[in-house]
Amino acid sequence: MDARRCMIVDLEKKDDKQMFITEQVESIQQSKSGGWLIRFRSSPRIFQYNKARLLYLTQPEVVNLEEKGLYINNIRIANVAEILRFSMRQSNFYRITYTNGFTENLLGKKVYITRTPIDKQGGSTWDYLKKLAEETGLCDEEENNILSKGYNLIDLKRDNVPLSQFLGDKTTLKTHSKPKQIYFPFGCNASQKAAVEAALTNQVSIIQGPPGTGKTQTILNIIANLLLEDNSILVVSNNNSAVENVAEKLEREGLEFLVAQLGNSENKGEFIRKQIPYYPDMKRWELEEPSVIKRLAKEKLQIVSQMFDDQTELAKLKAEYNALITEKKYNDQFNIRIIKDGDWLKNKPSVKLMELLNVCQLMVEQSKKPSLWLSLKWSFILGFPTLSLLRKDLSGFIAVLENAYYEARKSEIEKDLDAITTRLHYNNLESSIKELTSSSLQLLKHKIAKRYVGGNRSVFTIKDLRLKAQKFLKEYPIVLSSTYKSNTNIGPDYVFDYVIMDEASQIDIKTGVLALSCAMNAVIVGDDKQLPNVVSQEEALALNAIKATYKVDNRYNAVTHSFLKSCLEIFKEAPMTLLREHYRCHPKIIEFCNQQFYDGELISMTTDSGEDNVLQVVRTVKGNHARGHFNQREIDVIIEEVLPKYIDKGSLGIITPYREQAQAINKILKQDIASTVHKYQGREHHRG
């Protein structure tokens, strides 16, 4: 059969090469029963096939690749002579001929042909961002614009990465099926669990991680689940300590051999030099009965999930109970002449009492009287006395209903609170999380031990990072990098499965674009309440001038918007999870931040042991102040009044808005103890 005119697919054969049988067939025709009669070139015999087993496709469409890209299994393909698309209903199959004469047949799900180049999305947005990179990008020692070079490496035809939607593509962001089992080898709480689930089921997800809420822990759990599914992961940040923190936590669990810390030339060179040509011994990671541990992890996740739901419900019920008691108190004062005939309403469901109360209040407002049918209906539901009270004194009956509702709802909440509290006490959340963490980590290590069998390991050169990217990512599925170097870590024909962008509030828009171009999915992590990236006055003038020239949407304003802020406004359909549980500061310190900046949404998980002066203000007296970026009076107060009180009480940190002030303090104290808000942000100090 002519493979350019028809395609015969044997659906019973799962392997790509075996299921396409066109070139093996001499003739094909339909039998009277509706099946297929086939004669192969290798035999004169005629074989009969069930109709459902074979697809006989004709009239292929020649695909025009002009201004389009071809990607097979997410790898960019060049040197294509011809693409034929065979279609039937929702199924597509491709026959691809390369310029060297080689041909291959592929399932449609393995082939992606782009629609519109991403530089054509969103009007002038791409040109604007590229201009920002050209005019304000960081330069290396040889005065080469690093950012502009990164922009030139972006594959503009690849429109199935999040950058496309960021630039204005109206295509809906993809969602993914939830994995059958999600693992938490680094521990979890309610909001971290929600953040991990959102990351695994959405092309783009955003995690707001205020300080001390376990942001790194959440990132590690996402990485672990992606590793279990054999995905490649790029972790980027403008802050070196953020990616190093991820590396350290992975090393603590013996997983550092999966990590390649790349980015700039120095890091790449160090990685190449330090490669170990064999795998670590992972025999002890292999489980004799992984199914038992898997079942335990599943059971513990179900218990923990229920307990998280219980905790949330407990908090809601407590809030409702407190509000109800306050309402009841004022209602009792107002209805001092409560009708005593309400005992018969005891133990009636509060929802029914509220329903009738709303009906009665509406009738009073509309000066109506209840019909006989309505009175009979409610007397049937709540009891016979309802009939006479509805027909006689409606206002008095409203007072009875109000009192009965408060008593009924109060009793219901108390029962629910008691049941949930008992359940939480019985299950022991802390113990269950420990068992979930332990079993998850065992399964992760078991899977890795099975995948990376001990023995010799491939050693890569700098060129291999580009030319053998697929093989490299199988060996090192976790790559760490600066955001600036996001798309220079592997060859341009490849992208990562996921990019995780940490400290996104400190990344500027033009740099964040690079990271969105080099992965199929993005997890954007930051905190829009923290300080954004610093924009100098000189840079702001240049940025505003460029924006005025291109007239772009304000969501791309590089002066007023960090990358995180832009993403929050652009990716409206992406889930945003706030990590609420705070583990670092004293409750009084975090509660100040909570009320001032986080609308009371954070939950302190630390204990207030009644310490004195946890948070205090020291006012300086008049004299020797400066109006600029240096203040000698404040330095004197710090040295003479503040430090003597805390010098023997653990580590200290001094934060000041200005670098000049920090340098002066460090010079006088002869130690690196003071820094600016930007430098300290995200660092951990016991006292500061």
What are these regions (language model features)?
Residues 98, 129, 142, 264, ...:
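Flexible glycine-/small-residue-rich
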Residues 119-187, 311, 354-495:
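Conserved helicase NTPase catalytic core signature
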Residues 38, 44-198, 268-289, 449-456:
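Pre-P-loop entry segment of helicase/translocase ATPase cores
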Residues 185, 233-236, 286-293, 300-303, ...:
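Hydrophobic alpha-helical scaffolding
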Residues 1-62, 257, 264-269, 277-424:
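Charged C-terminal transducer/switch regions of large nucleotide-driven machines
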Residues 484-498, 505-688:
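Conserved helicase motor core of SF1/SF2 NTP-dependent helicases
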Residues 213, 218, 222-225, 229-250, ...:
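Conserved RecA-like ASCE P-loop NTPase motor core of nucleic-acid helicases/translocases
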Residues 168-258, 468-523:
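Secondary-structure-rich domain cores
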